[in-house]
């Protein structure tokens, strides 16, 4: 789809403040302006890409007086001359008449933008999912909403106040490059490489966003249903979260041991925010964990409809109050939630990603609160704790109070890149045989997909020869969830897996083997 181009114009009328705007379809603007008593519109030709038009409009608005048509033309030409494609340019003045023929009755279309941020290229799918018949040019509808100040439009990528390229969708200031653009024809179009998996953000692509309105839900009591009795440490953590709700502090850390039940601990503060008429986002870095959390949240809050957003599921609506999503999906939220619970903050891909950190915080309303849950807080969190900037609570033990298993390091000669005749070392075979004899299960982790294909296949093949049922699971496995269910129900003895199964899975009587543990990268 070609990038939209925008006409820069000035609208005037008796007793009215001159209005400087930009539009991809002047017919919509003429109808709206005429209905609001504007009589004349002067626009600059040719139309420009969104970031150039936006820059010109911003500078023109600093002139606090009505401009004569030719003066308006000269100012626009001077502003965009060094960067715009204006080899041939002129201006035209139109007389406005109040017909209203171009104005649409948009109903609740505005609600689709509440608390969200969308690229212009995402509008057709957005309107279609909301049950609207998509118009030939979806920007006709958004232009009317922009004029009515119901949504905001900006260039997805542009220059900030310091003259640095910045992606206004993901907040990145690096990883942005200039290139010839097939969509707008510019020779120096900015493109963000950080969030491109969610759609191409460029300086010629419009970005639409709007904050979620306050007081949108009626207050009603919500109580979580827990199928377990909290330990004293868990109860203390839940009470600390409740006190945090009253403190006015922006963020709180739940520092809990692996398997410490931190997810259930957060249900109390979630219920409180929902009771007060607020909205909650439960964000997880990995989509596999999202799938596992769906039934737990549904069981805990049966009275509240759960919306799920991941790479596989999209059940969100504008009226959703409790949302479970991957951290990548938070890129499409804007000042939307009163509470964000970020689970497994130490996990890839959230850990080390400035884009996802920015997205999660931007998903919060200005008065919103952030709860971060992790077993391994990073150095920045520890420094904030030491400086008293980050309140926190610890859950030092699991509910059964048994110590965490300490890994045993076994030195085994393994070829870095095993060939087809590779066979599992004796120590690996012995461990898997013990798993079978003790009626337990096993996960065998490998650091790379390449090793998974060779070593994993060899281990599964060896297992078949002695009656051990095994399977391979990775991000490329179509039946990954099925393999996990088979292991849970005892239909498989072991799974050879990539790091896809390192989180979000709880299995009784499980042994874990990590092969090639000396690999520095996975």
Question: What does each of the following model-derived ranges do?
Answer:
Residues 2-161:
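N-terminal alpha-helical interaction blocks
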Residues 113, 126-135, 141, 145-217:
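Interdomain "pre-motor" coupling segment immediately N-terminal to P-loop NTPase/helicase cores
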Residues 117, 124-126, 248, 389-456, ...:
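Conserved interdomain linker/interface between the two RecA-like ATPase lobes of SF2 helicase motors
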Residues 226-249:
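N-terminal pre-P-loop "Q-motif" helix
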Residues 250-263, 273-274, 278-293, 370, ...:
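Conserved strand-helix element at the start of the C-terminal RecA-like helicase core
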Residues 292-337, 474-495:
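Conserved motor-coupling elements within RecA-like helicase/translocase cores
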Residues 335-412:
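Post-DEXD/H (motif II) to motif III coupling segment of the RecA-like Helicase ATP-binding lobe
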Residues 344-348, 477-480, 484-522:
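Conserved RecA-like helicase motor core of SF1/SF2 enzymes
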């Amino acid at each position: 789809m070609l990038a939209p181009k925008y006409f820069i114009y000035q609208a005037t009328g008796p007793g009215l403040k001159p209005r400087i705007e930009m539009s991809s379809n002047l017919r919509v603007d003429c109808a709206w302006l005429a209905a609001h008593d504007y009589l004349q519109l002067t626009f600059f030709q040719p139309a420009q890409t969104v970031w150039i038009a936006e820059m010109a409009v911003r500078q023109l608005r600093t002139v606090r007086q009505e401009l004569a048509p030719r003066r308006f033309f000269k100012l626009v030409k001077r502003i965009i001359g060094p960067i715009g494609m204006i080899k041939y340019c002129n201006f035209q003045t139109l007389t406005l008449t109040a017909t209203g023929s171009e104005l649409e009755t948009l109903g609740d279309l505005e609600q689709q933008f509440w608390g969200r941020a969308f690229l212009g290229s995402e509008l057709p799918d957005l309107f279609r999912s909301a049950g609207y018949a998509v118009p030939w040019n979806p920007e006709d509808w958004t232009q009317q909403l922009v004029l009515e100040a119901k949504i905001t439009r900006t260039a997805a990528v542009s220059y900030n106040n310091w003259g640095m390229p910045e992606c206004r969708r993901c907040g990145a200031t690096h990883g942005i490059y200039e290139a010839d653009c097939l969509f707008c024809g510019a020779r120096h179009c900015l493109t963000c490489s950080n969030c491109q998996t969610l759609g191409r953000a460029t300086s010629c692509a419009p970005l639409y966003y709007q904050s979620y309105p306050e007081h949108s839900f009626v207050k009603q009591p919500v109580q979580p249903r827990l199928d377990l009795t909290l330990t004293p440490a868990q109860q203390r953590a839940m009470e600390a979260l409740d006190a945090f709700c009253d403190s006015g502090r922006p963020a709180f850390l739940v520092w809990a041991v692996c398997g410490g039940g931190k997810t259930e601990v957060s249900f109390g503060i979630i219920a409180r925010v929902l009771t007060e008429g607020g909205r909650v986002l439960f964000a997880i870095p990995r989509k596999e964990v999202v799938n596992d959390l769906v039934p737990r949240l549904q069981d805990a809050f049966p009275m509240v409809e759960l919306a799920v957003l991941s790479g596989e599921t999209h059940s969100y609506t504008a009226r959703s109050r409790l949302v479970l999503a991957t951290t990548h999906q938070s890129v499409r939220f804007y000042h939307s939630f009163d509470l964000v619970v970020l689970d497994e903050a130490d996990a890839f891909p959230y850990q080390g990603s400035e884009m996802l950190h920015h997205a999660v915080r931007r998903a919060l309303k200005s008065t919103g609160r952030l709860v971060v849950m992790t077993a391994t807080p990073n150095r920045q969190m520890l420094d904030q704790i030491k400086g008293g900037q980050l309140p926190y609570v610890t859950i030092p033990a699991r509910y059964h109070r048994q110590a965490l298993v300490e890994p045993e390091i076994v030195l085994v000669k393994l070829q870095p890149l095993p060939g087809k005749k590779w066979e599992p070392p004796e120590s690996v075979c012995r461990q898997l045989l013990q798993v079978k004899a003790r009626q337990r299960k096993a996960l065998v982790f490998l650091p790379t997909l390449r090793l998974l294909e060779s070593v994993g296949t060899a281990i599964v093949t060896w297992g078949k020869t002695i009656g051990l049922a095994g399977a391979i699971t990775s991000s490329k496995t179509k039946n990954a969830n099925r393999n996990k269910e088979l292991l849970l129900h005892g239909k498989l003895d072991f799974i050879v897996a990539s790091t896809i199964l390192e989180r979000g899975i709880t299995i009784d009587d499980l042994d874990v083997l990590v092969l090639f543990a000396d690999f520095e990268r996975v």
